[in-house]
């Protein structure tokens, strides 16, 4: 007769938080010491209110009413103790037998069915802190591989056991970084935010609070960190690209993408090993990298496909810029007047772009709703900050003098901005204009009728030019990310007559380097191309540059019109950048050491606001030390 082990259902009920008040209890068969099976019958619990039938005896080998789920045990005991459970198991095991079944035995014995843990179908694992810790199986050592379990923090269906509870990789990583870096979060809504998978990044304070509520153990994180400290060999391996998560007090840096084997070229003379931090400490204060289960600093798929070091660097730089955000900021959770402001001077906005707009996560590809006049203002400000952050990161930009930095960026930021809108519209498959805050302007005439007339005046002509002259050509050639980032750098580094002689010479060298990188990238991505086809593709890419300039000039007129009638809140900084005054940069220094934290002047029309003296607790003057003024 087949041997069976007694499975204590009441123990499993206590162990996994199961309620067995009205469940059937099976008849178990035990192997007695003399070898003869003895039968132990338990009776059904009777609930008078439920109207259950009287208990009746089931056949000995009938399956229980409960669901069998495979239990994965990770070397809880030594192999010598694994003999406690015989090879004749047919799906029901004792608690002690389950604890003593080693992974090695299960892997080597193909005739043994995997151990089964009998639990009700509707059971969800409870907080391990409320479990009876005197039980035989140490749940902290169990690696859950169950299918269908949900993260107890956000509800993600792809979950496992991490830090003492059931959690997904995203919440696991968020909890680990929060503990390691001792982060403090504040909820703006009284700690009542709903933490679900779709919006789990919206409020980090409530997310961390829920991590503790469901039983995540901070001590497990600290012990894991101690293990890493004791075994630092992985971090010292040559060519290691382990991500570094910056805190508010540490500068952020782009990982090196240099390789030991690269083609001999002037492009390879680019010094990737000595790339400075993206921003100084004062600039990175209150900034974090976006919380994702996948580290944001890892090389993207497009970068991995490119064998040109400069292209890989530019792609990583693009990713780092997009993932540089302020804490507790989101387009959906912030009030309109808290997101952005335009009553600042150009100099102050370039020194401290975070004053113009909060660094909310870019949502180019969302396309969740049609744009409004408020979206025009918010998207303009957020896109402006993205462009400023991008330029300040670049080593080639940092090598310019402070005055040349200001002159170049002031005249190129609008064109860089529109290239970003164009490429993101292309990637989103949008028939119109995709905006950074998740809204979009439609090209369809019927949809345009639903919008504010100010939106149509701003975007109607722009959307036609953008689609016909830029997006459609990008679709036809299927532009990749490497070509986009090179084109973006070429738009930024365009010589201007008011640059110094050294600045113009530097920009010429930089442009030659980027064009050569573009040629190498196209050659590698399209190896079947002939030299004529390669040249044709590069020509088509470079021919997009005049269309970008034309689009920027068209926006200049639209912004001036809306600012004149005080529409879309585009007076002040947008008007000043788009107006003809941006071409005039007088000589002389301004002794005003203004740092913008709060601007007290009122900007009631299309003019620049006055500077104001504010406390110097916020300062980035050591990073960008230009002090030109406009009169």
From Swiss-Prot:
GO-annotated molecular function: DNA-binding transcription factor activity; RNA polymerase II cis-regulatory region sequence-specific DNA binding; zinc ion binding
GO-annotated cellular components: nucleus
Statement: the UniProt record of this protein carries the keyword Transcription regulation: yes
Comp. bias (Low complexity): 246-266
Keywords attached to this entry: DNA-binding, Metal-binding, Nucleus, Receptor, Transcription, Transcription regulation, Zinc, Zinc-finger
Compositional bias ranges of the Basic and acidic residues kind: 222-236
Recorded superkingdom: Eukaryota
Zinc finger (NR C4-type): 151-171, 187-206
Main subcellular location: nucleus
Compartments it resides in: Nucleus
Chain spans, region Disordered: 29-65, 222-266, 582-631
InterPro entries referenced in this protein's UniProt entry, alphabetically: C.elegans_NHRs, HNF4-like_DBD, NHR-like_dom_sf, Nucl_hrmn_rcpt_lig-bd, Nuclear_hrmn_rcpt, Znf_hrmn_rcpt, Znf_NHR/GATA
Biased composition (Polar residues): 33-51, 596-623
Family of this protein: Belongs to the nuclear hormone receptor family.
Function: Orphan nuclear receptor.
Record-given protein name: Nuclear hormone receptor family member nhr-34
Organism: Caenorhabditis elegans
Taxonomic placement: Eukaryota, Metazoa, Ecdysozoa, Nematoda, Chromadorea
Gene: nhr-34
